[in-house]
Amino acid sequence: MFDITRKCVEWGDRSLTIESGKIARQAGGAVVVDYGGTSVLATVVSQKSKEAVDFLPLTVQFLAKSYAVGKIPGGFFKREGKPSDRETLISRIIDRSIRPLFPSGFSDEVAVVCNLLSYDASSPPETVALIGASAALAISGIPFHCPVAGARIGYIRGEGRYILNPSADELSVSALDMFYARTDTSILMVESEAHELTEAEMLGALQFGHEHCEEIIKVIGEFAEEARKCAPAEFVPCDLSTIIDSIGSDYKERFLVAYSEKEKKARVAKLDAVRASLTEDLRVKFLSESEGGSKYIAQDIVYAMKTFERSLVRERVLESKSRIDGRAYDQIRNIEIEVDLISKAHGSALFTRGDTQALVITALGTPQDEQIVDGFDGDKRERFLLHYNFPPYAVGEASALRPPGRREIGHGKLAWRAIHPVLPSKADFPYTIRVVSEITESDGSSSMATVCGASLALMDTGVPLKSSVAGIAMGLIKEGDRYAILSDILGDEDYLGDMDFKVAGTREGITALQMDMKVKGIDFAVLGTALDQAKEGRFFIIEKMDRVIKESRGAVREHVPRMESMLIDKGKIKNVIGAGGKNVREICEKTGAKIEISQDGTVMIYAVGREAIESAKDMITGIVSEPEVGKIYSGEVCELAKYGAFVTFLGARKGLVHISEIRNEHINAVADVLAVGDKVKVLVIDMDKDHIQLSMRRIDQETGDQVDCELYAPQRRNGVAAGNTVGDSSVNGGGAGSVYVPRGDYGGASAGRNGRGGGKRDGAAKSSSSAGNGGGRSSSSTRRRHSAGSSGYSSDSSSGNTKSSSSESSGGTGGRGRNGANGDVQNGPAAPKKPRFF
């Protein structure tokens, strides 16, 4: 049933397997490539274009489903959505590697889909996907020049050792992350990030990748010979020489005059006029109805014009030794730089190079603003974000704005790679950094203008970069043995040239390199020359930038979020957070600060102003502090009981305000004066390991100040007064029977409605009085309560006299019986007054 073709080879320290004939047999070409546990299904389908076009309608899509790593997608729908940035970047790598290998003039629709089936962190998926796409094209029968292979390259600087297809762990210590693609004869594509490597080290990486890709190209060729069911279709482009030769010398002169315009807007206007005129002439000449009809179609006219125009301009550059706009090969366009031009931005820069302009703006945020990336290679948090925007008005077009496309994502990532190696560590600069590049004008090299503008804006923000970073786009025009390497290319030079070579870096070395080749036969000697010329241009641009701002500002601006850290006991983390995050939310709402708590007890506080940070610190300090007797705290009533109210304070602390400590007057029920959720001020009056006793009546609830709170005079109800004073803080005598006297810290007699009560404080009271129908009995130095009657009064001893060492006067005696008379009163010696409050 299956006609399977399989090829296996050892590549590096892993096994590479290419297989076809089992899966996706309806596709024009389909292969499964496995390398070290990473597997990709690559398919290719081609069909005739529905309408005549003058370009190659090639689409490349790399898809990474979560099943490749044994996961279920997050979110409500549990299904993959739009491609991630990582998938988009891998799709671009494949596209840029295979697009130059289709024959010129080929306009059939081609769709390449690479589906990640399995992922292992030891093997990069882009390597496997490109090999799969190349093999699928090789067996599809679609016109395709030759196989292509790619590899990821790492570099251990201290050892001077290059790594083939490094694992994720190896990349974490590598000074280089490069993807290199080639054919059997030439370099095709390079994408890399480096930690300030020299030109020689980068060239060595290119040569290393070139050598190791060669064996895979041979394997793909052998596999295609075995698996191919039919020979590749031969594409014969239309012979356009007749059309090209018919273009007169007057049009040649008009094109050269138009291209000599230095300003892009004027140049484009003149070129459009010449092209429109020539197109009309050629249509009349070659597409008019005649006997037998024309052998040409409209797109042939377009191809012929492009070929003529490209050949004319390239020859002029090589012959005259000057550029389209009159510059020398290594000359940089005029540069204008301005920083700090947007008042409310955290940092800004306007970088203008010729007719290319980037307005770059920065914003700093807290670690809570970090981007959470949920990818097939694991979840991570990204603290540096760089977004590149290319609106239509940048090139004078009137069209609708659309979400960022592949080009914008790719250019933004290139600029990100250029800046990332010079950023400070999170420990040195814990902010989340976002850079936005708005391309306001474009005439080539807008991604490198973004690099320069981003470096300037970050320094203007106060981000301590290691050094300035500049970028430059290089071009190449090659005809036979003649070639010209162009610095700081225009958009037209990019379109008409053979190479787009972008280099970014510092004075110390290269941080990013991107290269796309359109022709074969570029050797490493030419690349070495291009790297050296790019270095000179990079230094020239950095010098211009340093004249405006050479070092990062000493401090961030006032309206940038401030941040401070404090360390709390790990056991107190729950107190700061509170039930369901209540406490930390309240702190954020009241102060306007943002708070982040780590498991080790580190608390990061972020706020725009110093006052907000200090307020948040004070609130956190209050929560984690141990309560102290005699101190006042803010709290909230959390529970009501018959005997009092429970109040939470200092975060999760809970204490009891006894009913007698709520107010200075009698209350019938706690619910009459308090409700759950009330904000109150409390004084800690006593505490032990498990219980905290609080008082409200001793605090002015409006001001939060402690007040001079004396015991109030109790009212006598159906009873008989029992002397002048009771306890050390009383003024009037305590009552018996139904008299209500607060009990607690103040000692003395304390009676309920049935006449119960007697107490002491710190051993000061020598006896405890009791009320009852019978006579009293002695209770020396104890804190016992005796039986209570309805209204009679009994003294401590039969003599009817009572003494208290801590009172101003002592109570007397009462007769036996329900309506006994007052006993005699004997005043005791006055005792020194103790402090009433903490």
Curated annotation (Swiss-Prot):
Belongs to the polyribonucleotide nucleotidyltransferase family. Involved in mRNA degradation. Catalyzes the phosphorolysis of single-stranded polyribonucleotides processively in the 3'- to 5'-direction. One of its GO terms (cellular component) is cytosol. SUPFAM superfamilies: Eukaryotic type KH-domain (KH-domain type I) (SSF54791), Nucleic acid-binding proteins (SSF50249), Polynucleotide phosphorylase/guanosine pentaphosphate synthase (PNPase/GPSI), domain 3 (SSF46915), Ribonuclease PH domain 2-like (SSF55666), Ribosomal protein S5 domain 2-like (SSF54211). Residues 788-810 have a biased composition (Low complexity). This is Polyribonucleotide nucleotidyltransferase. Its EC number is 2.7.7.8. One of its GO terms (biological process) is RNA processing. The keyword Protein transport does not apply. Residues 630-697 form the S1 motif domain. GO terms for molecular function: 3'-5'-RNA exonuclease activity; magnesium ion binding; polyribonucleotide nucleotidyltransferase activity; RNA binding. Its cofactor is Mg(2+). It holds the Pfam family S1. InterPro entries: ExoRNase_PH_dom1 (IPR001247), ExoRNase_PH_dom2 (IPR015847), ExoRNase_PH_dom2_sf (IPR036345), KH_dom (IPR004087), KH_dom_type_1 (IPR004088), KH_dom_type_1_sf (IPR036612), NA-bd_OB-fold (IPR012340), PNPase (IPR012162). Mg(2+) binds at residues 494, 500. It comes from the Bacteria.
